[in-house]
């Protein structure tokens, strides 16, 4: 079977040939998906760059190898909402990049995939500011609902462009956890975020599109929500924030997991320790499918360590998997 067929079997827990790093995809994205502005910027720019993205959020690239940091928030004040100009998902300046990337796609062993980076929660605090938004959930709930609804209106507009181009897989993402627990209370998530998420999931599920979701941190409070929404692949499954056995138990046969190799291990090494952890994760999470093996964060790891990671997945990721240490 080719790489795409194998990935489908992983997602469906249906006897794949091997564990791989992730679904093979040809990514589509619009101008602004990675925080670009009409005048440039984005995460590939040099350290020290300052720019304004398509939403009016001001950014500063402070560290090499990671995304910039939002430093100015156009909706920090509730009064700013009345005069705020929302980005238009039909703006040809945004879509030119999307159509160029779509024209480069050749059907075969990859999914045509779309991206909705900072789908809802993260986009809202970039617009409003984290501290402000945390207060406004309680003091200005109508304002928060308006902001979240308009963000999702934009995402739905982009989704319709993706669907017209024939996407089979989409990547969504909002970091909802800390190392110890949820970033937001379950009541806040249920009242403010979940209704908006349902709008986007409903559209994609109606078109039988696979949905991947990126959520850093502890997953205990949101895992049932992701299962209910219909997330097909969840990443990055942070080792230091989760009980991996419990996460696998709750998702077995229902949702594939991606990631789960510790950033701490990958940064510190040595290669022998990385190999041992990969073998442990393969057996722990992937015995019956449903697992893509990779880092639990995207950081600039030493090349020797990433080489050791992928070599271990290649060597030990073929089914039937072998238990580590002769178990």
Annotated model-derived regions:
Residues 28-101, 107-109:
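Helix-coil boundary/capping segments in enzymes
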Residues 1-26, 52, 61, 85-327:
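Active-site loop segments of alpha/beta catalytic cores
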């Amino acid at each position: 079977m080719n790489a795409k067929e194998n990935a489908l079997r992983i997602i469906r827990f249906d006897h794949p040939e091997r564990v791989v790093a992730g679904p093979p995809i040809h990514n589509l994205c619009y101008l602004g998906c990675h925080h670009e502005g009409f005048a440039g910027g984005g995460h590939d720019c040099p350290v020290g760059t300052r720019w304004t993205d398509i939403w009016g959020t001001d950014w500063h690239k402070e560290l090499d190898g990671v995304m910039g940091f939002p430093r100015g928030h156009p909706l920090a004040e509730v009064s700013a909402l009345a005069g705020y100009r929302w980005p238009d998902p039909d703006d040809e300046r945004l879509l030119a990049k999307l159509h160029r990337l779509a024209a480069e796609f050749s059907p075969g062993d990859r999914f045509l995939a779309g991206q909705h980076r900072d789908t809802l929660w993260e986009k809202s605090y970039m617009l409003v500011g984290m501290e402000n938004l945390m207060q406004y959930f309680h003091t200005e709930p109508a304002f928060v609902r308006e902001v979240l609804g308009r963000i999702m209106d934009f995402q739905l507009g982009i989704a319709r462009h993706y669907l017209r181009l024939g996407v089979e897989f989409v990547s969504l993402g909002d970091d909802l956890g800390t190392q110890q627990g949820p970033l937001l209370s379950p009541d806040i998530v249920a009242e403010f975020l979940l209704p908006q998420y349902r709008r986007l999931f409903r559209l994609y599920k109606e078109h039988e599109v696979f949905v991947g979701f990126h959520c850093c941190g502890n997953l205990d409070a949101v895992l049932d929500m992701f299962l209910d929404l219909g997330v097909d692949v969840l990443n990055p499954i942070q080792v230091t924030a989760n009980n991996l056995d419990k996460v696998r138990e709750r998702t077995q046969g229902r949702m594939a997991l991606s990631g789960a190799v510790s950033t701490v291990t990958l940064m510190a090494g040595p290669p022998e320790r990385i190999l041992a952890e990969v073998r442990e994760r393969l057996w722990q999470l992937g015995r019956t499918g449903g697992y893509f093996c990779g880092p639990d964060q995207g950081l600039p790891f030493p090349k020797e360590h990433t080489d050791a990671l992928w070599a271990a997945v290649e060597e030990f990721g073929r089914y039937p998997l072998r238990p580590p240490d002769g178990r």
